[in-house]
Amino acid sequence: AANNLLAALIDNARHQGQVDLKEITWRRVLDVNDRMLRNIVTGLGGPANGIPTETGFDITAASELRAIVCLAAGEEDLRVRLDRLVVGLKRDGSAYTCKELGATGALMALLKDAMLPNLVQSIEGVPAFVHGGPFANIAHGCNSVAATRAAMTIADWAITEAGFGSDLGAEKFYDIKCRMNNLQPAATILVTSLRALKWHGGVPLPEIGKENMDALINGLPNLKAHIASLKCFGQQVVVSLNHFANDNAEEIDVVRKECLAAGVRFAISDGFAKGGEGALDVAREVMAAVKEGSKPLNYAYSLDESIEEKIQDVNTKVYGGQDVSYSSAALKDLAKIKALNMGFEKLP
């Protein structure tokens, strides 16, 4: 509702002659992934029904407002973030913001309750916050700061998930969410399975449940790369192996030995089949790792670096890459960001 209200206010401001924009960067959203609506033309009903505009719909979870709500430390921080939200470009190339549009108050009214974390419970009665979750491939892929801080305040232990693999999810969790809110994780759990490792080892998806020591060994470098990346951030790492009923004991032992050789803790998780009881070994290893203590986060890059330098640091330190090549569209976007001169290049 807030996302589409903002889109309507932008179109209304243009229709009323309040602003002349050369580009509108804000799109509408809906909950159905309808590819026919990704790129459309609106305002075809004549002067009384708006200005013809090339636009489109994104899926709701991809809305920038979701990322803003999840990163906001409180209502005042939310207002500041909404004020500086860029929704379009004026004819002179400068940014047209939500504050300039005068839409912040209306959005605050809609998002005020959305800032409150949703408290639920597992089937075993364990309390949990389910709140937020912007996509990690286009945003930061973490739950809300409000939910994390609430969990840390009321519980002895707070566990949060960073979406996607550790190269994407953990990196953004550390470099964006933790850095912007002064959070210091005590340990990091890296989840894997024999099936996943065999798939990385080249086995076709229908065959990953079968015993295949060669494929497992071929997939282990992927796990070791993730471990090395997490250790570079200064984290105590616990590898949690999701257990399946037909897992081979010898293959599990190979993974265990590789983890111990890499200097990290290892435990088998049977939580899917046995609930909390099946995850006790993981919990014990996490508690032991926390006692040893992680170092203060060693971020992948400095905020003083240029955008290109930050991308290169993530590429080499996290993904193990060498050089970065940019598409023409990416280069145009970088040029726009720098031309706005709003300090974006100094953000995580």
Residue map of PLM features:
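Flexible phosphate-sensing "switch/lid" loops adjacent to ATP/NTP-binding sites
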Residues: 1-348
